């Protein structure tokens, strides 16, 4: 173990727990559900931008994405910039309308919104189960990424790192709730920004300058400096699929959507769009360029996902590497706490309280259950991450795609199409989810497109056809989640 690397990381974790304790003490008056899962809808613009960005930027962006850039070259850096409008799309399309309706219905979760709009218990159960299955896959990826970071950069055995990482996140999320999550996201967003810039400068310096780094890549494989990338992987169909999966489809991610119902006012969302887009641009460009140029410094890595943690140790002094280790750790932690909290909210609010509505005001029981379920989910994820695959980006994209295939059209059409009904939404969710699962499982790529493209197209068609066989439900005027 390298103490110079570990000490700054321990200090960072202490700060994270300190923020969580502060958040617990700052809980405002109101019902437990609204405060614990939404922070009483009090986010300002900077916090909104940072939490949305930190939630979106995950192990895939700090570990898997740069790993792919290492393997395929500078073309992957250009591909990564396709994600630039993600915050603008999320807040622009969902933002105001979603927040207004959420306040009208007193919605705490995404499924509250779906029930208020479609008045279908079956739809809520299907959405809840889909969310839990996909989130378990997505969070497993984050746990693997965190443990690999500690293994490579700090010399901590994978299993030990997994325990340290998993227990820390489960504890601070369980007891701090949404307020702790978004405050830590803001801290983690700042850490990511500084860390990304420092590492990129270090990589360019170690490679002998930008020009020398590109020349080295060209000598290794001329395809590494072409827009198509190594193995000509970046075809038009691939790039279109990637844009749908990691940019447009983000609108349908539940942990992103829930951020759109928890901000304070219109000024916050406008500021959030501007700041969030700038932060995403810096992080995506910086991390992926560091991964691509890292091949000029480390040409012989056998596991591409190890490029960022290995570069940290190679190009930075040990203490600086420890400080920077907090950046990808921050990216991973912020994504997990958002998904962990959303999973807990789904089990408590959408499943348990649907079966036991008489427990809505039993705040003592709800507090205990929320913490216990969050800790239990954390333990299950530790078990799932114990034997990891080689490249985590594909597993992460698989989980992302599943969520988008199920939630995108019921969300967007539910907001903007008055005639949308439960029959259409259920048809879209079933067709999108099942088709995506089949295509992804058997690796079927029609005309070279990722499964998310045909899944979303046929899901939309299923919505339109199914909608003709249903009738519009009267929308709820208020949901009994708060008084």
Set out the residue ranges of the language-model regions.
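Membrane-embedded helix-loop-helix hairpins and adjacent transmembrane boundary segments
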Residues: 1-483
């Amino acid at each position: 173990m390298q103490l110079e690397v570990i000490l700054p990381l321990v200090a960072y974790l202490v700060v994270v727990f300190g923020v969580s304790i502060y958040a617990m003490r700052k809980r405002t008056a109101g019902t437990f559900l609204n405060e614990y899962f939404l922070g009483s809808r009090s986010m300002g613009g900077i916090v909104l931008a940072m939490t949305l960005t930190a939630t979106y930027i995950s192990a895939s962006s700090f570990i898997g994405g740069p790993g792919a850039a290492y393997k395929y070259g500078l073309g992957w850096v250009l591909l990564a910039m396709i994600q630039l409008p993600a915050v603008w799309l999320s807040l622009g399309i969902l933002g105001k309308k979603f927040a207004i309706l959420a306040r009208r219905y007193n919605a705490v979760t995404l499924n509250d919104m779906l029930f208020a709009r479609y008045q279908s218990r079956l739809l809520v159960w299907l959405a809840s189960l889909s969310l839990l299955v996909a989130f378990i896959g997505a969070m497993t990826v984050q746990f693997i990424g965190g443990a690999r970071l500690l293994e490579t950069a700090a010399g901590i055995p994978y299993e030990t790192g997994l325990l340290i990482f998993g227990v820390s996140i489960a504890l601070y999320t369980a007891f701090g709730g949404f307020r702790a999550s978004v405050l830590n996201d803001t801290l983690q967003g700042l850490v990511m920004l500084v860390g990304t810039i420092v590492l990129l400068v270090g990589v360019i310096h170690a490679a002998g300058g930008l020009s020398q780094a590109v020349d080295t890549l060209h000598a290794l494989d001329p395809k590494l400096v072409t827009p198509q990338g190594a193995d000509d992987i970046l075809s038009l169909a691939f790039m279109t699929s990637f844009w749908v999966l990691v940019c447009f489809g983000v609108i349908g991610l539940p942990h992103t959507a829930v951020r759109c119902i928890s901000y304070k006012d219109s000024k916050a969302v406008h500021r959030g769009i501007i700041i969030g887009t700038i932060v995403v641009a810096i992080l995506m460009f910086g991390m992926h360029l560091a991964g691509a140029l890292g091949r000029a410094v480390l040409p012989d890595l056998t596991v591409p996902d190890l490029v960022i943690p290995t570069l940290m140790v190679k190009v930075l002094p040990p203490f600086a590497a420890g400080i920077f280790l907090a950046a990808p750790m921050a990216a991973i932690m912020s994504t997990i706490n958002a998904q962990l909290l959303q999973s807990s909210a789904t089990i408590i609010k959408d499943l348990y309280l649907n079966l036991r509505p008489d427990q809505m005001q039993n705040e003592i029981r709800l507090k205990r259950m929320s913490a216990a379920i969050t800790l239990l989910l954390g333990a299950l994820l530790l078990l799932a991450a114990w034997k990891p695959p080689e490249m985590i980006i594909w597993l992460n994209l698989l989980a992302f795609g599943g969520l988008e295939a199920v939630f995108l059209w019921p969300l967007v059409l539910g907001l903007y199409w008055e005639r949308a009904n439960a029959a259409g939404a259920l048809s879209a969710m079933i067709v999108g989810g099942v088709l995506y699962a089949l295509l992804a499982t058997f690796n079927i790529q029609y005309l070279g497109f990722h499964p998310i493209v045909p899944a979303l197209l046929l899901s939309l068609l299923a919505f339109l056809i199914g909608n003709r066989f249903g009738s519009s439900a009267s929308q709820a005027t208020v949901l009994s989640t708060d008084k």
